[in-house]
Structure formats: C-alpha cells, structure tokens
Amino acid sequence: MNKTAIKNYAVWARNELIERVTRKAYEYGVEKENIVADECAEIVNGRLLNDDEKKQRKELIKVINEKGFDQVIEEVAYTWFNRFIALRFMEVNNYMPQKVRVFTNSENEFKPQLLDEAITLDLEGVDKEKVYELIDTNQRDELYKMLLLAICNDMGNYLPGMFTTISDYTMLLFPDNLLKEDSVLGKLISDIDEDTWQDQVQAIGWMYQYYISEKHDQVVNILKGKVKKEDIPAATQLWTTDWVVRYMVDNSLGRYWIERNPESPLKEKLAYLATSKNNDLPIVNERVNPKDITFLEIKTRYLIQFNVA
C-alpha cells in the first residue's frame, strides 16, 4: 500500500472538495459573510430555483445560522468524500449490489460504466425520459450527477448508516465537473492504484486518517487552547491500525476466553496475546458459553453479543 500516495490525495481532496462545495453555495447566493436574497427567494444570481432547490436552500441557510458557514461546508465536503471512497472500495472488490462500476469501466479506466448503462439501469429516482434527454443533448455531467445521486440513495437500502437518503442541502452542494481528469474522482482513479483497495478496510482507514490530518494538526495545537466542540472528531478520531486492533481484541476478549478455556485451540490464533515468560495465563474456574458473552466496544459505545453455532 502506497501511503504517501494516499496521504497526498486525501489532503488534496479535502481542500478541493471544500472549494467546490463553497462554490456551489455561492451559486445559490450563500457566502460566508453574506447571503444574497432571503431564504424564500425564487430567483438567486439569475437562477430560477425549482421547488426542491428552494427547500434545500432554505434548510442550508437555517443550518448555517445554527452551526456556522465553515462547519457546514466542512461536513458536506466530508460527506461526499466518505461516499466516494466507499463506492470506490466497493466497485473494486465487486461489492456493488447494483452490479455496476460507478467510476470506472472493467479496465479500470476513468470511464464510468454507470454512464454506459444509464438507459438500462433500474434505480429509484432516475427518470428515463430525463436520461434520454440528457444523452441526446450530450449533458454527460448532469446525467452522471443524477445517476450517482441515485446510486447513493439506493445504497441506503444496504448501508443506511453511511448512505442516508440524499434530499437535503447536501444534494444542493454536490460538486460539479466530476468527470474531468483533474477532479476529485479523476485523481482518485489515477493517483491511487486499484490494488490499494484490495487491502480491505485498511485503505479506507488511512484515507480518513490523512483526510483529517491538516484539520487535526490545527485543532490539537496546544497554543490555541481548548478544542472546540465541533473540532473534537478531527482531534480524537484517528485511524487505528490493524495490529493495534488485534492486540486489543486478543488481550481483552481473547484473554477472557482462554483463561476460562485453557485447552482451546483459539490460543494459537491469538498472535498478539500477552502471556508470562512461561507462556502461561491464569486459569479461571468458570465455564462460559460464547452466546452469553456481551462485549462493550468503548470507542464506538457498541454492545456486541456473540451468536456462535
């Protein structure tokens, strides 16, 4: 895995997405220091808004008034980065339930199969007449936007935690010109080898780590004092490498089981289990059924119960 390439891309992508999302906000008359026209305006910067855009713009202004411009732009930029990375990971590993590559073709060229199969795709929210119209008028960017948004919404049926239905201001701020070679998607394909994504979740973890690295360095600077509430994720949510996770699990849940089942063959598989010099562990005279174990994962606050046949 080329972590240098991942870092260079992720740091660049964050700044690029923030700039693109900021431009989209500007198109709808929303700037950091100024909001052009009131929240119910029908025409903004010479643009006639449809009903969805008016609703989304009104919500955007409301959220900005609550959270602040920079925070909202940062959140939207990360939302799109997160989804793009997840989709790339899934298409490379053939995990897409729609059985279509969203960014590349079968040769891993930046020629989305999604566009080639636009006519035959059966996705909720895709108007076939609109598809034909966009194809006939060669509006590839607009067609790609419609299809990509539909894919993201459809993915909500499979991964609702990551792909919540997009109908709010997040859609309004969807970045433009994604089919260009120097776009966030174009460079995602050209700068990160396809093999990188076959290293399972490691690639996603390092992408996140480097994406927030600049923000992390800013907010944890002790000279700036206390970390703000909205900056806590960037300051604390760092990628935990595979060996650290294995060490934690081996010496918590794994140790708990081996102490109560000293003859268990599982011990040979716990590569990071810490034992005494004699390779011994204390024996606890307590029989336990795996189904009865409830494990608290403190970092995510999940209670995990095991269902073992």
Regions found by a protein language model. Give the residues of each.
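Preference for the N-terminal adenyl/adenosyl cofactor-binding alpha/beta module
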Residues: 1-309
